Amino acid sequence: MGFQLGNLYVEKGQKTCGFLKLPFTEDELPVTLIYGREEGPTVLVDGGIHNAEYVGIECVTGLAKQLQPEDIEGILIMIHIVNVNGFQARTVSVSAEDGKNLNRVFPGNENGTYTDKLAYFMEKEIFSKVDYYI
């Protein structure tokens, strides 16, 4: 039995990379999923809640390249950049769409602005599936 995260799926003992579709926009989150050979916790590591946190983004990207299923137990979800909207627009810490700081709007609102919806999506579709968040 594998692990499903939105439109992405990974089998036990496998690694997959792709783009997680967001239901409220055409933006997609770059994600790497690794399902270890043994059962264990589900861990989320992300970069780019603030889109100019380049060290975190690079760290997640490097980790995603290096880690393999035999290196972990459980499931590792790596979101390389969460605030892709702000990253693409080169804003420092806010979404270009609405000027909001993603880190300040959790748990979000499914009927709110772009950033509110992104926070809501993270809460409902991702945070709800993890045991630990780094």
Name each model-derived stretch.
Residues 1-134:
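Structured catalytic-domain cores with a bias toward divalent-metal coordination
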